[in-house]
């Protein structure tokens, strides 16, 4: 996920056009490379968030029906439609989540339905931040943030296992983390 000022290479376009544009700009096919998935904890997080997002309106309709404010059919209809939809969106979000280190670029993918790709030249990385929410800490996940010298821009690798995040940062910027890593 990008933060700070960002530049879009092309407006919404067919995948082939977007990939060809990226290959011309990057000078390689980094976006074509297979990405490393973020594991079962990230998958659980994506599925849980998808289902909980659709469970809230279903629960509200169930409560309204239980209090005789509404008939039962809206709650049942919402459950039949929204819960599988939330699950499908969670699966899609996990499928699109990944990262790779390819030919001097950190490549990250995230998003739902349309998905987003970003590639950052590793020579532009000046530092790393590991961020964790309370929920990520319990799942053993972190958000790895690559800080760049380009103003306030950064690139986030969402919900990656902590040990993978440290290894990725060390591989992307050899020597930068060495003083901070335990022998």
What residue ranges belong to the model's regions?
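N-terminal basic, Ser/Thr-rich segments that initiate or prime the first beta/alpha elements at protein or domain
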Residues: 1-183
